[in-house]
Amino acid sequence: MKLSMVMVLLVLAGQLSGCGGNDDNNSERTHESGDSNGDVTTPDNDASSNDEDDAALEPTQLRSVEFAQSHVLPPGGLSWDLKESGELQLVEKRDTLVLATFDEAVQAAEVRVYDKNHQLLSSLNLSKPSDLPPTEGDDLPYSDDAWSAVIPSDDMSKGVNIRVVAQGKSASEIVTPALHPELDLTIQSLPFLIYGANESNIPFKIDDLKVMFADPDTAGQGFAGMPFSKTHIVNHPLGVFESDYLIAPPSGSAPAKKVESAADPDYSKPILDMVWHIEYATGDMALNKITFAPSMLIDHSKAGPIKTRGFGGMAYTGSGASMGYPSLGLLWHEGGHALGLPHSLSGSKDLRGPYYPYAEGSLSGSAWGYDQHKGYFRSPLTAPTSRYFVCNGERGGGVFQKTPEGRCYRFDPMHSADEQKDPDAAFPLFSDFNAGKMQRWVRNRARMNPSNDGFQVLDDNGDWADFVPETKHYAGWHIKEHYPVSFDKTTDFIMITYSLAGTDAASHFYNPIRYKGNAIEYVDAINQDGLNSINADISSGARAKYSDYCRRQGCDFTLKVTYEDGSTSYRVLKGSARKDWQPSVWKDDYLNENSKDSYLFWAVALVAPDGAPKVKKLELLDTPILWNLSPTAVMGAEALVVKQL
């Protein structure tokens, strides 16, 4: 019986590409089978009374069944025998288009949707093939014989299964699609307005940058194109970061410097690190959130009212941190990096891989997409209405892949951001492979619990379960694995730069930003128990609770914050210029102003005291080998950098 189930599924899967019009299937994509990962089975006696009523009729014979959310998938989803790949499956709690084709002519049909206990949830009339959704750019239809219906999101839960009933027939075999659990992604937009950027000298409205142009139509398309139950594009809790200058770190051949115009060649250099620190300090780096910083950088040497200097974008792969010029194509490209995606072109050619299955970083071999917001399919071929419909040679080093008829395939957004879509489409189409990798990234992150005061992670059964983070490795890397410990509280975000070499203008506090949100844990520098917890002396064999907190790179500085009501807060600044695991030994080049070892950067998200008084003064205190100091010594330490507000 097990063998026959698998054989039936493989027969169905083998015909899906012909139904979809995709004529290049020489990929390493495989169709999954098995009882728990999407299956086609014969009816049992528990299905439903509806099915028992027509049991005397001949069963409906299906040629294929597919499901579409962001992509059109076989019941078992898709997987790849490649390094670092994911599994692309349907997700719970999302409207799902079901597509059915038959072995014989039918006049009418319905799909019956059941829960995991075989209780009927919905009976949906299937629309005729003539009513199938169109294709982006008025391209060729996905199918000329597929019947379709939309399964509502409430019905899409673990164990859901369907049976199709053609007029005059009994129900088909049971089809059980593989489902990932409910997966959500939040994309946070944090505009960086630098060197005097304002609405008089930039080409965009700041309110639009705060949500990356996500009006209802754009937000709907963003959700539709991502393989998640929900995708939110929102303004970051910090709102906007504004500064008339940036501090560029030492380059190795030149010292740190204060940059005050985008005319400087290092005009955008510090931003990505700043975004990374924001992700880290707020605790977002552990969660299902990414941050994109649309950056407006003013070049004061430019004539005319608009003085922004253009550039591309950057991200730390898999970190959740990204930045770039404000465009939806770059949001998808740099956001893709933040979600763990490398460049598709290099991934397809990497001799250690490949890490991307389709030639030249293209969509040749990828499944069709489906945009439920626009109500159309998206072919892996370049849309006829694209300016790249007629394509020759290469694009950015990637050779255009073509069908035998000369049609060009799109490149994945991780190679070419947005040129091959219909002009009315907001976002490019990700390959099925990269969609699966993004699902894997989100499945490996925690999410906030429903009350927004704790966390959930996926357990071994694939269900969301409550999770309490613990500190590992004596806090050598993080306390409580850099999960937030305060939630939705009034908080001040503070960034500090400091040159150990005394480089002019390189030691600064950026203006603090008050926001309402989350923050990770910091050590109180004037609490004796806190100081004891980070004691890095392990010579006796005994270890403090957080003994490696300072052992990795030292703890030599303290942040002091004074509020308008006279109250103060002191926090240990983790990280200095000490040698790894030698917290009392300076690095060799710590006084060389051209060396990166001479430059320190910290970010702290500090919960405001009761009553939320405003910050009045910021100070960087000199507290070498901090764990050996007393609270009194910390409070009396010299201030190296002071900012009055």
Curated annotation (Swiss-Prot):
The primary site where this protein sits is secreted
Disulfide bond residue pairs: none
Keyword annotations of the record: Hydrolase, Metal-binding, Metalloprotease, Protease, Secreted, Signal, Zinc
Record localization: Secreted
Q: Provide the cofactor list for this protein.
A: Zn(2+)
Region named Disordered: 19-55
Per the similarity annotation, which family is this? Belongs to the dictomallein family.
Q: Which GO terms of the cellular component aspect does the record hold?
A: extracellular region
Give the source lineage, highest ranks first.
Bacteria, Pseudomonadati, Pseudomonadota, Gammaproteobacteria, Oceanospirillales
Instruction: List its EC numbers.
Output: 3.4.24.-
> What gene is it encoded by?
dtmL
Positions that bind Zn(2+): H333, H337, H343
Q: Which residues form the active site?
A: E334
Q: Which InterPro entries match?
A: Dictomallein, Peptidase_M66_dom
Question: How is this protein named in the record?
Answer: Dictomallein-like protein
- Cofactor binding note of this UniProt entry: Binds 1 zinc ion per subunit.
**Where is the secretion signal located?**
1-13
User: What residues does the Peptidase M66 domain cover?
Assistant: 177-448
Specify the domain of life of the species encoding this protein: Bacteria
A Gene Ontology MF term for this entry? Answer: metal ion binding
Enzyme class label: hydrolase
GO annotation (BP), single: proteolysis
Keyword flag NAD: no
**Pfam families under this entry?**
Peptidase_M66
